[in-house]
Amino acid sequence: MNFELTEEQTLIRDAARQFARAEIQPVAAQCDRDAHFPLELMAKARDVGLVNVTVPEAYGGSGLGVFELALVTQELAWACAGINGTLSLNSVVADVFHVAGSAQQKASVFKRLAEGQFGAYALTEPAAGSDVSAIKTRAVRRGDTYVLNGGKMWISNATLAEF
């Protein structure tokens, strides 16, 4: 069994490493001090294929897998875990729709992510933390719609998200 990175994976890792050192590391400490996310970094990272890593190419994403996302995340987080969290979250949002979205939902969400919109991720609950087996929020079908009942906290990308 070969555990070496493929040539494509090496290029992806190296691009993420170079971006992290050139673009993220120089601003990371100031962003932490100011509790500020540099939106211009999102556009730059998207332009070089480091955002929306798991969004299919047909919708404007990189069309890569979770292993390649892990390579990108590792390099970006080296420079700043906070900035990486925001940059990589769109792939987490995309993965939810890969697994459970209808074709119509996938088309809508993937397109919006690829256009530069931010998605949010609501997992943590007051009584459950991030233990998915203890989550109480439920979606109940009522006719043609779903009614959500429950409470969430610490929503990832909540201040930036457009959906």
Regions found by a protein language model. Give the residues of each.
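Alpha-helical bundle segments that constitute or directly flank the non-heme di-iron/ferroxidase center
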Residues: 15
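Glycine-rich flavin
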Residues: 25-163
